[in-house]
Regions:
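Alpha-helical transmembrane segments of helical membrane proteins, especially in multi-pass transport
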Residues: 114-137, 159
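Alpha-helical transmembrane segments
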Residues: 40-52, 107-125
């Protein structure tokens, strides 16, 4: 069985790769004759990159917080962590689609829905991992206070609902959806 330290190191590597891949979602201009205008037209892609960079960064910090409360790991927890990492490393793809759609002003609402669904699935993966670890204090350290466990459980389980509500925002306005995701991230800092 993997050690907790090895799982943390692997997870850190996945987070690092995902956050690095985000920059590749911003396509360079294809026409350099009017470079200023071309760069200005890319601002929505840069905004999507910044929001996703912050979101993945917050996820990484939260991952470390969760692992500081976990005393031991077991096989089901490892697989739940892998499911979470699957959603994390996928974030650059919908970020690129979302940023490009916003920049082109084509298909932006559909792209916003895809981004929001991705974040909702990610939030559900967080919930599953936390609920498994904390249920009956299965994997938690004895030092972790019960009131903090309850607060964390509420935060993790409400995350899926909050992100799911962003799907509704996406159907109305893609730029509002991006702002909504920025605010969700800000609330988790």
């Amino acid at each position: 069985m993997l050690s907790k330290a090895r799982l943390e190191a692997f997870s850190d590597g996945v987070f690092a790769i995902a956050i690095t891949l985000l920059v590749l979602t911003i396509a360079p201009p294809t026409d350099y004759r009017d470079l200023g205008s071309q760069l200005w037209d890319r601002w929505p892609a840069v905004a999507a990159y910044v929001v996703s960079f912050a979101v993945i960064g917050i996820m990484w910090v939260n991952h470390h917080a969760v692992f500081s409360t976990v005393e031991r790991i077991n096989r089901p927890f490892v697989y739940l962590n892998m499911a979470l990492l699957l959603t994390v490393v996928f974030v650059p793809y919908p970020t690129g689609v979302f940023g490009e759609a916003l920049s082109r002003d084509e298909g932006a609402r559909v792209a916003a829905v895809v981004y929001s669904v991705t974040m909702t699935i990610n939030a559900c993966a967080w919930s599953a991992m936390w609920l498994y670890a904390s249920s009956g204090r299965r994997l938690l350290t004895d030092e972790f206070p019960e009131e903090r466990r309850r607060a964390a459980t509420l935060a993790f389980t409400s995350g899926g609902l909050i992100y799911a509500s962003s799907i509704g925002v996406a159907l109305i306005n893609a730029f509002a959806c991006l702002a909504f995701h920025a605010q969700i991230g800000r609330a988790h800092v």
